[in-house]
Structures are given as structure tokens and as C-alpha cells.
Amino acid sequence: MRKLHFAEEAELFAYKAWHSLKLEPPADLERVAARLKIEVHEREFVPEIDGFYLRLPGAPPVIAVNNSYVKPLPRRRFTLAHEIGHHLLGRAISPDRRYFVFDSATPRRSILERACDRFATMLLMPEDLTRQYYQELSHNPSNRTAIMSARFGVSAWALRRRLRELGLSTWTRR
């Protein structure tokens, strides 16, 4: 059996999406899904469910994202990117069979779930552009997080986490 390296595959898939589709921030996730022939639906669910991915033999894959008023747009974008990650990374687990996963806000995350989060992070905030924008906004550190999170279409929390991951400070002097 082939050893699964989800984190490396997540990085590769995100890189390929940006370069093959010539994406610009904020990443057009509907375009990414369309290229992969994934149907995307927005529906209101119970607040505990962010979204789900479903693949059945003989049918197009489906992603449903919770568009409840309690789920802000940056959260829905992250969920959609995460579910696209399930489409790409789930093939290693179940290439030709049924595959269903729904995501909730539970703190316990499997290796695959963490890899899908990584894919979503890298798809929404590629390293090269994150570093570039961070440097470009060095003259405006007090507003940098707000400007960058709006540019990438992500929450300030997700951006700060990405900046820490890249070793870029989010601390500003007062």
C-alpha cells in the first residue's frame, strides 16, 4: 500500500491550482471547483456543520457550504477551499468509491482534516503572495492584517495564523 503524504500533496495541489488557473487574490474558488467538475451548493444547515463533500459513483462530486448568517463569508470561503481539499486528497483514500465527509467545528482533527486545512490555507493565502503583501505593507503595520485579510478574502484570525506559520510577525508597536 502506498504511504500517504497528505501535507505534501496539499501543498502541491494548491500550487498547481494557482499556476494552472492563473489565480489572483482573492482566489476564485468557484472557478477552481468548476475546473474540477465539482458542483457547489450553498444551503443553511445547523450551526455545527460548516459544510460537506460527497462523491458517489456515476454522479458529479458535490460540495455544500453552510451559508447561515452565523457563518461569515471568510469562514464559508475557507470551508469551500477545505472541501475542495477533500476532493483532491480523498482520492488517495477512496479513488473510485463513495466518499462522504462533513466538517464541524470539533477540535479533534484527523491527519486528513489537517491536510485539508493546510490545502485551504495555501489555496487562499499562497506563501509567495503572503510574503509579498506583507513586505509591501511594511509602511502600514497597524492596518496590515485588515488590508491583507480583505485582499485574500479570509478572516483576520486565519491570516494571523498564516503569518505566524511563515515566521512573519503580527505584532505592532504602539
Q: Each predicted region: which residue ranges?
A:
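Active-site hotspot residues in diverse enzymes, especially metal/ion-binding acidic/histidine motifs
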Residues: 1-174
